[in-house]
């Protein structure tokens, strides 16, 4: 079966020449759900073995939405209730052991179905890391056509793409909002932003948590190009068609040299990041923040990081400090 023939729950596929366009459709908000990550895992694995695919364009399939941010419900098994605090140094070996188990063929499905919320969360994180690293090692070029908000986990998926184009529109925002939710990035941002922009900018962006406009993101170096909204997909696909004509072996070796050549510790860095993410998610403050998020989501009928972000930016929406 070709990659374009996959039947996925949250991604619509269309192939023209060697360019496969993947539209994420996860209503109502296009959050990065467990199903989205599972589908991206399946898609990237299939693209790697499909000789007819030289580039993948990832975009949002809902009007005005790219990948808004990670789905808080997907984290429920790990951070939805207070539990004894887990230091990152204790979480790290647990996550490594879990990854070893999940590496066994068929284990992800079993743990996802029978492991409860914690099991589903572990599979989600395992697939996330596996998928984004596969994208970075692949002979397929990945391009993000950012047609809506790309915050938190949505921004981390975009950062895993080789090129990022965004629509020149006011509703498009990019950035890492995790500290506003009493968390740290868990899908790669601490590692990728540091490699992309340097430690000084990475720490500023992740500590502040404030989303950027596309023009700000372009100046920072988060984006490669800003395109008039009506032309975004066509222009991204045109670039993808050029890159898809490159030798896949050349693309793969070039990407591996760029992403992994200067520093062999990206994988270890991702492990450390996930461990810290789990650790901060075990606090009572994280549970309060999650509760407040869902209250706002119901009240506003949209993510509060878009519909009413100021109290979260100011740190006044919920007490994130008290233990």
Language-model-derived ranges and their functions:
Residues 1-17, 63-65, 209-214, 234, ...:
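C-terminal alpha-helix plus adjacent terminal tail
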Residues 39, 43-46, 127-139:
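Catalytic-core regions built around general acid/base machinery
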Residues 1-66, 76-77:
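Conserved CoA-thioester-binding segment of acyl-CoA-metabolizing enzymes
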Residues 60-130:
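Glycine- (often His-adjacent) and acidic-residue-rich active-site loop
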Residues 165-167, 223-233:
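Short acidic-hydrophobic, aromatic-tinged amphipathic segments that line or gate anion-handling sites
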Residues 125, 129, 152, 211:
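Glycine-rich phosphate-binding loop at the start of an alpha helix
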Residues 131, 135-139, 145, 151-205, ...:
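CoA-thioester-processing core
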């Amino acid at each position: 079966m070709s990659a374009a023939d996959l039947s996925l729950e949250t991604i619509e596929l269309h192939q023209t020449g060697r360019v496969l366009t993947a539209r994420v459709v996860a209503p109502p908000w296009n959050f990065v759900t467990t199903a989205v990550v599972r589908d991206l895992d399946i898609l990237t694995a299939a693209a790697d073995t499909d000789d007819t695919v030289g580039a993948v364009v990832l975009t949002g399939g809902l009007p005005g939405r790219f990948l808004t941010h990670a789905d808080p419900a997907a984290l429920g098994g790990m951070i939805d209730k207070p539990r004894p605090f887990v230091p990152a140094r204790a979480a790290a070996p647990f996550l490594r052991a879990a990854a070893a188990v999940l590496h066994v063929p068929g284990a992800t499905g079993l743990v996802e179905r029978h492991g409860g919320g914690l099991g589903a969360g572990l599979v989600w994180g395992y697939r996330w890391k596996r998928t984004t690293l596969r994208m970075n090692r692949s002979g397929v070029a990945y391009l993000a056509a950012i047609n809506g908000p790309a915050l938190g986990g949505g921004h981390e998926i975009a950062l895993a793409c080789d090129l990022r184009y965004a629509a020149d529109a006011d509703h498009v925002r990019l950035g890492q909002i995790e500290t506003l939710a009493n968390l740290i990035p868990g899908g790669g941002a601490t590692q990728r932003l540091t490699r992309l922009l340097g430690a000084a900018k990475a720490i500023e962006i992740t500590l502040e948590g404030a989303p950027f406009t596309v023009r700000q993101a372009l100046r920072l170096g988060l984006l490669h190009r800003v395109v008039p909204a009506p032309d975004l997909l066509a222009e991204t696909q045109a670039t993808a068609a050029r890159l898809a004509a490159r030798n896949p072996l050349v693309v793969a070796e070039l990407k591996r040299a760029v992403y992994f050549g200067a520093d062999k510790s990206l994988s270890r860095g991702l492990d450390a990041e996930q461990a810290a993410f789990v650790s901060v998610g075990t606090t009572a403050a994280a549970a309060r923040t999650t509760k407040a998020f869902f209250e706002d989501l119901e009240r506003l009928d949209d993510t509060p990081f878009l519909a009413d972000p100021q109290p979260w930016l100011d740190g006044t929406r919920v007490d994130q400090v008290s233990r």
